[in-house]
Amino acid sequence: MAKSSQRKQRDCVNQCKSKPGLSTSIPLRMSSYTFKRPVTRITPHPGNEVRYHQWEESLEKPQQVCWQRRLQGLQAYSSAGELSSTLDLANTLQKLVPSYTGGSLLEDLASGLEHSCPMPHLACSSDAVEIIPAEGVGISQLLCKQFLVTEEDIRKQEGKVKTVRERLAIALIADGLANEAEKVRDQEGRPEKR
């Protein structure tokens, strides 16, 4: 009887103890510093002031190395909501910067991008002049050699897919037969109970 009352007391004490993650004390940053540093809690209510150390005020915000990668795959729309094509790019840039007197606006923009984010140079071709007729050849990011897919390439790929599917079908049939044979062996090894 005494043991059960001691257990009840112990259980009550354990329930009354607070959980380690729900502490109301100021949390301490556990790091390689000799002294533990207090952590500023940021709560999502308005009017909360976030305190900074003096050395934190002089820190610069991190910058993205290649910001234009975020823009890949995005479509440009006009103010009317119509999809803009790549052929309108040169005209749009000329409208935005009508007083520009340099050689080629797109070349200067692309060279600025290349200096801000070094990317591997792609194979250039004169076919890209057809994409942007108003601009010259020399923009490495916009003048990529086109990859043409021929009917022969499609037929070769279809043949490869067909042979792989046939091999997969044969493998599935063989696996099913092996499973059935294993079941038969298991049933022969154990006599049936009646």
From Swiss-Prot:
The entry's keywords: Nucleus, Repressor, Transcription, Transcription regulation
Protein's organism: Homo sapiens
Region (Transcription repressor) location: 1-104
Organs and tissues of expression: Highly expressed in testis. Detected at low levels in pancreas. Not detected in the other tissues tested.
Originating gene: MBD3L1
Main function: Transcriptional repressor.
Transmembrane segment boundaries: none
An MF annotation (GO) of this entry: methyl-CpG binding
Entry's family note: Belongs to the MBD3L family.
Protein name (record): Methyl-CpG-binding domain protein 3-like 1
Subcellular location: Nucleus
The keyword Transferase is assigned to this record: no
GO biological-process terms attached to the record: DNA methylation-dependent constitutive heterochromatin formation; negative regulation of transcription by RNA polymerase II
Chief place of localization: nucleus
Record note on domains: The N-terminal half of the protein mediates transcription repression.
Additional observations: Does not bind methylated DNA.
GO cellular component: nucleus
